[in-house]
Amino acid sequence: MEYRIEHDSMGEVKVPADKYWAAQTERSHENFLIGVGIETMPREITYAFGVLKKAAAIANNQLKPEKMTDEKLAAVSQACDEVMSGALNEHFPLVVWQTGSGTQSNMNANEVIANRGNEIAGKKILHPNDDINMSQSSNDTFPTAMSIAAVLGIEDKVIPAVDTLISTFKKLEKDNEGIVKSGRTHLQDATPITFSQEISGWRASLEKDKKLLEIALPELKELALGGTAVGTGLNAPKGFDVKVAEAVSEITGKQFITAPNKFHALTSKDEIVFAHGALKALAADLMKIANDVRWLASGPRLGLGEIKIPENEPGSSIMPGKVNPTQCEAVTMVAVQVIGNDTAIGMAASQGNFELNVFMPVIIYNFTQSVRLLSEAMISFNKNCAVGITANKEKMSHNLHNSLMLVTALNPYIGYENAAKTAKNAYKKNISLKESCVELGFLTAEKFDEVFHPEQMV
């Protein structure tokens, strides 16, 4: 491998000749051999740095045109566009497990954009610190990258995936109207419900989760950029924070604003905790929905068997013909991971000692993983399972008419205690509710038929 010599304030460093990064990135690359090649800084953060560095250059060009000249801005903008496109991903090698402020990743972006920008310009006009990091600090850029990544993840990935699943459930509701089945509470038989009503509960849960995510978004759209090192805005020109937020909004198509209190923006990550709480709520509901589906599909002969789901692959290496609810299992595992991520995020967010939180990389690492897993799990579950759910009407009817909880319909006619006696007697003797009620003398057979209509109990 060929190398070139780069230098920083600590001296010279050998850097791979074919990479755009420079001395500080290389030091981090050598000093933090933790999860190398596996737990790299999320690409969502790399993209966000491309956005914010371009936005900062635009704002600096407007406020300090003698330093961020039009020529420099053009080179920086093109380099940032390449970062956002993913064309320069190989030049962002750093792992999550580095400094808690994300300083090395900020410098990684500065160095790559400067070197690529100089290549675009055909001459050395850009310096990583003096130009790309102008009016900024790692302490306000990394929180800003977190905000951008979180907003884009929720708006462009999670919510569309939620909407897709909601649409599928709406169709299933319509397709299954009028199909009455046994309800269940505590994993025990309960009074009847229509399959459409049951599905509507799933759909409404996702609609509520979407609302919670939307409630979280405005706080995520407040940017720390402009606070610089400790929130005072040292070395940033007046109005930089407002202009850079406007530029970020223009680049992303999302409405970002500058945080009203930069001291809070640097040290607190409460908006991330709150937003991830909404993701955790979504995970909890997906866990419930996936569990309902696999319970209802259990069998095929010895389980509930009230619905059928698509058969996507063989389920066992030893039991021929076995098919498992694999999509449900994937969703439930994702839910467990997201709930675990929430614990890590909450703990890390509590570590904002004095003017800066220094657990930011692990916070956004877990946040972006949750976004990615939830959105992809919902898409997979929808495509490979939910759209293919069908009701086993015969099994639903069989289970319904064998449910002892239908006795609840007799309460107005024979009273709660007599209804309970009827159910217990039927269970003990393995006879029908009608036979039990008549045997105990509570109703005649004719009166029982007159008042007992399970399909009207919904």
PLM features per residue range, with description:
Residues 1-458:
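Conserved, well-structured ligand/cofactor-binding cores
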